[in-house]
A protein has these predicted regions:
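Start-of-domain marker
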Residues: 5-61
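Short loop/turn motifs that connect adjacent beta-strands in outer-membrane beta-barrel proteins
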Residues: 5-8, 24-25, 59, 93-99, ...
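Solvent-exposed loop/turn segments connecting transmembrane beta-strands
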Residues: 5-13, 36-45, 73-80, 107-115, ...
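Residue-level signature of outer-membrane beta-barrel architecture
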Residues: 20, 54, 90-92, 124-128, ...
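Transmembrane beta-strands of outer-membrane beta-barrel proteins
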Residues: 28-30, 62-64, 97-103, 135-139, ...
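Transmembrane beta-strands of outer-membrane beta-barrel pores
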Residues: 32-38, 66-72, 92-94, 105-109, ...
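Outer-membrane beta-barrel "beta-signal"
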Residues: 85-88, 188-200
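Detector for outer-membrane/organellar transmembrane beta-barrel domains
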Residues: 90, 98-143
Length: 200
């Protein structure tokens, strides 16, 4: 897809999260993601994260993980990419708000590039809303930096809400405004995102 078509494009990102609790401090997870672009018409991206979340302190989670990614290139070529990553996620409660600050360091095993991602999320749970299923509106912002570009090269501003469908299944719907630098030009896109969470 050309840069002209890519700017102001609409995309759909479909995400899943499968979490299996080992004990009070350890949970294993697998998180597949799929993306469509060109006004939802072209499937172009898949990524799966797999790892563990460790509750190191009451206010701090640490998550070592591996990621497999493939995306569509010219000629319908889908080269695989592999990454190792570590998340450090401090969390605090501020009045009725829940605030988290995910700091992710990624290393590309194929291109040897280090990437740092920072995502700050603020959520306000309403536990009795939707007939007891609960409703949690949130806003978030995530910035990207890597040692190849040596600069901040992408930002995602997001707002949405989450709710519990049944006891172990939650749904999150959101809108993301993404700005990404490409050839000294900032390409903007509008993203509709769904996240289905399964907890075991």
């Amino acid at each position: 897809m050309s840069d002209a078509r890519a700017d102001e494009d609409w995309e759909y990102w479909m995400k899943y999260s499968f979490n299996a609790r080992v004990n009070e401090k350890v949970a294993l997870f697998i998180k597949p993601q799929f993306r469509w672009r060109d006004d939802f018409n072209e499937f172009y991206f898949h990524r799966t994260w797999a790892g563990a979340t460790l509750k190191v302190l009451k206010w701090l989670d640490v998550a070592p993980q591996y990621s497999y990614k493939t995306s569509k290139h010219s000629g319908n070529h889908w080269p695989p990419e592999n990454f190792l990553a570590l998340d450090l996620i401090p969390k605090i409660a501020l009045f009725d708000l829940k605030v988290s600050d995910r700091n992710r360091v990624m290393y590309g095993l194929d291109d040897y590039v280090w990437t740092y991602r920072n995502r700050i999320k603020i959520a306000r749970p309403f536990k009795k809303a939707l007939w007891g299923h609960g409703l949690t509106p949130f806003i978030a912002d995530e910035g990207f930096y890597n040692d190849k570009a040596h600069e901040f090269y992408e930002n995602r501003a997001e707002f949405g809400f989450g709710t519990k469908i049944i006891k172990n299944i939650e749904l999150e719907l959101s809108y993301i405004f993404r700005s990404k630098e490409k050839k000294d030009k900032w390409i903007k896109s509008h993203i509709l995102c769904s996240l289905l969470k399964f907890k075991f």
